[in-house]
Structures are given as structure tokens and as C-alpha cells.
């Protein structure tokens, strides 16, 4: 298990617990000589895939490949009051996950994937891929 692709529906850099946890996991995988690639969507104007920026923001020295993917769905940055905020988020998450998994499987020969995303896990699993799925709590979607 030397090559690991970590696909997540988060944005980086960010002060959220999820983003901090993801970087921590990747940092320790890299410390243990694993070749890691992080893939995430460009959902925010603050999103950045420059490893030097991430190292400065999170305070680590390890290196790994970082790819910010295009996020062209109309569910980006939920400013203002929206009655459909959660629904829009899930639709966007579903569509992005389906697209990114298809793309990664076409151009990547990774043997192991790591994710916190329900939809990324679903699409990788449907394609018989080896997936490490990190889950911290049961959600309504996961119960479904």
C-alpha cells in the first residue's frame, strides 16, 4: 500500500475540524513513506492546491501531491438564506463525486483510496476499488 489517493469533498486550506483531520491523516501517511495524492473540489474562492501554502497554513513539512478539481455545479458557496441549502449540497456532492471518481479511475492506477465522503466511497466501491472509509458519526444519509 504505497500509493494512496485521498479524495474528499472538503476545501483547503480551512480551519474546520474535517480539514484538519484530513491533513493530519495525510501528513502521517507521508511520514510513513506512503505516496499520497489529495484531490478536492474548488468550492471556495479560498481553495488552494499549492503544497507550500498548505504547509504554511497547517504547519507541516511533509510533501504530497495536491490537486484541486474544477467544481462547476450551481451549488457553490451558499451565501445568503437558502431553503434548499442541504439538498443543494448533497446534489453537488453527488455530482462532483461521480465525475471525479470516473476521471480518477480513467487516469490513475492507484491501488488504494481513502475518503471521508459517502458518495466517493459509494462510487469507488461500485467500481470494485479498495477504499478506506473514514466515518466519525452516523448521518441521515448513512442510515438511508
Predicted segments — roles?
Residues 1-62, 107-108:
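N-terminal subdomain of nucleotide-sugar transferases
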Residues 39, 116, 134:
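A cross-family glycoside hydrolase active-site/sugar-binding cleft signature
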Residues 49-51, 55, 63, 69-112, ...:
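An amphipathic, basic-hydrophobic alpha-helix
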Amino acid at each position: 500500500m504505497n500509493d494512496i489517493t485521498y479524495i474528499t469533498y472538503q476545501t483547503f486550506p480551512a480551519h474546520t475540524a474535517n480539514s484538519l483531520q484530513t491533513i493530519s491523516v495525510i501528513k502521517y501517511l507521508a511520514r510513513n513513506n506512503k505516496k499520497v495524492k489529495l484531490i478536492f473540489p474548488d468550492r471556495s474562492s479560498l481553495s488552494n492546491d499549492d503544497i507550500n501554502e498548505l504547509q504554511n497554513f497547517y504547519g507541516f513539512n511533509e510533501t504530497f501531491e495536491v490537486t484541486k478539481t474544477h467544481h462547476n455545479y450551481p451549488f457553490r458557496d451558499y451565501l445568503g438564506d437558502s431553503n434548499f441549502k442541504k439538498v443543494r449540497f448533497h446534489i453537488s456532492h453527488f455530482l462532483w463525486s461521480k465525475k471525479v471518481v470516473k476521471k480518477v479511475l480513467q487516469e490513475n492506477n492507484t491501488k488504494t483510496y481513502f475518503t471521508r465522503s459517502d458518495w466517493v466511497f459509494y462510487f469507488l466501491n461500485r467500481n470494485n476499488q479498495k477504499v478506506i472509509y473514514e466515518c466519525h458519526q452516523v448521518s441521515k444519509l448513512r442510515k438511508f
